[in-house]
Amino acid sequence: MKKSRKKENMDSKERNQKEAERSEARNSESPAEKAGETKVSPENEPSSPEAEKNPEEACREENEILKDQLFRLAADFDNFRKRTARQMEENRKSVLEQVLLDFVEVTDNFDRAIKSARTAEDMGPIVSGIEQLSKQFFSILEKYGLERVKCEKAGEFDPHRHEAIHHIETSEVPDNTIVEIYKEGYALNEKVVRPALVSVARSPEEAEK
């Protein structure tokens, strides 16, 4: 009888000890483990819509963006070209208008001179008036950059400014001397636009070669 009670006491102690161990094990678990939660790794996280895009689709979208930018640049350049062309044409017309208005003044003076010449008995004033008109006319040309090419009789022939239309054999003057001037030459802003037409001396010895 005593042995039976002793055995029951030992079994009770063992049960209490095991129960205490199980209780201690439960208390040492983390809240996440108690709730049965599992930690999600970065690899298992759901990806964003941007990250899920197909590389080919992303490349196609970028290509469309670049194409749109190119079309916009082309349109801007075309508008700039047309605007510049219009502005240049307006400037050309404005300059031409001013030039023509300047020459209209000379035309008015020519008309007055012609009327006076028809009834004048003394041509002296008429000649003087025409000379003044010539000066007025050329002053307008100079205003826009036109000037006479330097060319004088007995001067030296310059192939860059003069054009020899005749050669006169003579030993009285050196070779390449200007003998006669047929037409004046003109330069616009220092560029020869029409050479002076002249005759040039050439020695008989040079002509025989």
Swiss-Prot record:
Q: Which GO terms describe its cellular component?
A: cytoplasm
Q: Name one GO molecular function term.
A: adenyl-nucleotide exchange factor activity
Induction of the gene: By heat shock.
Record has Protein biosynthesis as a keyword: no
Keywords, in A-Z order: Chaperone, Cytoplasm, Stress response
List the subcellular locations.
Cytoplasm
User: Which SUPFAM superfamilies has this protein been placed in?
Assistant: Coiled-coil domain of nucleotide exchange factor GrpE, Head domain of nucleotide exchange factor GrpE
Cell membrane in keyword set: no
Matching CDD domains: GrpE (cd00446)
Q: Which family does it belong to?
A: Belongs to the GrpE family.
Q: What does this protein do?
A: Participates actively in the response to hyperosmotic and heat shock by preventing the aggregation of stress-denatured proteins, in association with DnaK and GrpE. It is the nucleotide exchange factor for DnaK and may function as a thermosensor. Unfolded proteins bind initially to DnaJ; upon interaction with the DnaJ-bound protein, DnaK hydrolyzes its bound ATP, resulting in the formation of a stable complex. GrpE releases ADP from DnaK; ATP binding to DnaK triggers the release of the substrate protein, thus completing the reaction cycle.
What is the official name of this protein in its record? Protein GrpE
What is the native source organism of this protein? Methanosarcina mazei (Methanosarcina frisia)
